[in-house]
Structures are given as structure tokens and as C-alpha cells.
């Protein structure tokens, strides 16, 4: 709960620190995506707007949080990644925090479904295979 608020608070603090040292303004990019009708409250356009407002009132310069994928679902992102030549082995989705994807958490399930919906082979090595399980 509220983990994106915590992550972005750290990112704003880091961006502020970089700005104070180098006078280089930073933009903060997040990978929020659409989950159909089930968006998490801290991955919405309203949340991004609120974080931008928080940055304006709490930092010495105006930082912008950007969410370029916010209207795309996993399938769209995987197809875009393929088009851009992304090595999906180097991407990570799992919530559990191990070195490998667990295969059971919601993020792992959505990752597998995204590759399935995009008709792409999932190159991910999962600790637990849930190929027959559904979300």
C-alpha cells in the first residue's frame, strides 16, 4: 500500500539533491500502466498530478513526474518493447523481491498474461511455473 508514494517521495528528494548540486532540473519517469478497469490508486493520472503538485510545493524547483505508459496495458507495452528492441530478460516485474520472478504474485501473473495477449514468447525464468493457472 502506498508504495508509489514512497518511491516518488524518494525520487523527488534525489532530484532535489541533484538540482542543488548541479543546477540541472530533472524529470522523473514512472512506468505506471493501465490495468483495464482495475487501476491501483497510486498509478492513476490523478496520482501523477498530485505528485507533481507535491513537488511544486515541497521542492525549490519544479520537477515533473511523467508517466508515458499510463494509457497502455501490458500487451501494448510488450509490443512496444519488442518494436524498440528491448531485452525482456533484463526487465523485472515481481513483487516478492527475489533475484528471479516468483511466478505466483499478481505482477508475475500479469507479466505472463501480457506476453500471452501479445502472442509473444515469455523469456522470463520463473521460480514457480503457473502456465496452467489463470489470473
What is the predicted function of each stretch?
Residues 1-135:
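Nucleotide-activated chemistry modules centered on ATP-dependent adenylation/adenylyltransferase
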Amino acid at each position: 500500500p502506498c508504495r508509489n508514494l514512497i518511491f516518488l517521495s524518494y525520487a523527488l528528494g534525489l532530484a532535489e539533491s541533484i538540482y542543488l548540486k548541479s543546477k540541472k532540473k530533472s524529470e522523473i519517469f514512472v512506468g505506471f500502466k493501465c490495468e483495464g478497469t482495475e487501476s491501483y490508486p497510486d498509478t492513476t493520472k490523478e496520482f501523477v498530478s498530485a505528485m507533481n503538485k507535491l513537488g511544486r510545493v515541497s521542492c525549490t524547483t519544479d520537477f515533473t513526474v511523467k508517466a508515458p505508459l499510463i494509457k497502455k496495458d501490458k500487451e501494448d507495452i510488450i509490443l512496444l518493447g519488442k518494436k524498440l528492441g528491448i531485452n525482456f530478460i533484463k526487465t523485472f516485474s515481481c513483487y516478492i523481491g527475489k533475484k528471479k520472478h516468483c511466478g505466483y504474485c499478481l505482477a508475475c501473473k500479469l507479466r505472463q498474461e501480457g506476453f500471452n495477449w501479445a502472442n509473444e514468447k515469455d523469456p522470463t525464468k520463473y521460480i514457480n511455473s503457473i502456465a496452467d493457472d489463470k489470473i
